[in-house]
């Protein structure tokens, strides 16, 4: 071995000898198991690393898995032989700190126009699911009644979550390790509300509490006392570790609560004003960049009217709002223009809404910031989907909207439509024949998850990784 080349490194893994190059190991990245053998210039630290060029590094791990992972680092291709189980391989990849390489080899970068159905998962919970949320690492969680079922990126189920066994209203990932749940209040107790859980063990780490301190709305109440509340729609701001939730308390204790993700302590509470709706919100979305605001949408049929707002917590002001209050209650308006969902598109400086026939409408935020509109005419509606009339299923699901990577997604019945470009042209449809209408969908971790209403099943859509060009 005295004649070994300077860029060669030898390993003894579980009694089996492997030889590779420093270049191959460097592909694992600085934060991997192999990163410690390189200096800042990516030269091998032979002496400082505790080994010499002629010495084998012993690793007491599975050699069959190591061979697969070494080939992955060398070629970018993941080939798993029959004698290696995927679960064992993923466990070894986690040990070496290269799970991200494995995931990248299994499915490609997200693109709505290249998605393919990967698999479907049937749950064991009774009744229909109510919400599905994608995790940042390719896992997901599904809310069924008072239980949340958690799946990792390998789609193996972890211990289920519940918050005092109260009905779950919303759920979301803080990060790959933490999930927040909002639930209904049990009258006469402090049960329900919000809780933060470990996504792997199911442990309740802490409950979020709400109090109303020195507020004009609560000047005659016990200031600072903990209050029971029903938490609704959730939103996370990853930039400053804030969690937002719509809250329904007693009397006029309705609004948007704000908590610190790390400590669980309440930071703020934005009270709804008379004649408006915040505490019953269906959807919250954080807008960063030039807006730095929270979108709050309360929609039909939760309320008789629709309310969409942008809240600036720095100035504690509602800087923009829209409602269909005062719109003519003709059949045309009621049947065709009821807003069922809304999503802000920061890059396009607009808010997109959808009605029950999947007609899309757009409001330009640049022209309307600082104003309040109560005219349904302020929405520029498309009429792309008029053919949907007359073909609605017996129990249709309300359409849902999402924006990801500059693409717009809209679910309708058992199909998800993909729109692209400045004019939001329909470019793709995602559909399968089993499970019934899609009641919810979510995008994250380079995957799209679709939850069906008629069967306890959800689909996983992925992009097939590009071929390795030799």
Describe each region flagged by the PLM.
Residues 1-24:
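N-terminal BTB/POZ boundary and linker segment
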Residues 150-160, 189-218, 248-278, 287-293, ...:
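Per-blade loop-tip surfaces of WD-repeat and WD-like beta-propellers in eukaryotic adaptors/scaffolds
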Residues 143, 182-183, 246-248, 296-299, ...:
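Residue-level marker for isolated small/hydroxyl-bearing positions within beta-strands
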Residues 137-138, 176-178, 239-241, 290-294, ...:
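Short coil/turn segments that connect the beta-strands within blades of beta-propeller domains
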Residues 10, 17, 30-99:
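Canonical BTB/POZ domain core
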Residues 435-470:
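Blade-level signature of beta-propeller repeat domains, shared across WD40, Kelch, NHL, RCC1
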Residues 108-128, 151-157, 384-385:
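A short helix->beta-strand "capping" segment at the edge of beta-propeller domains
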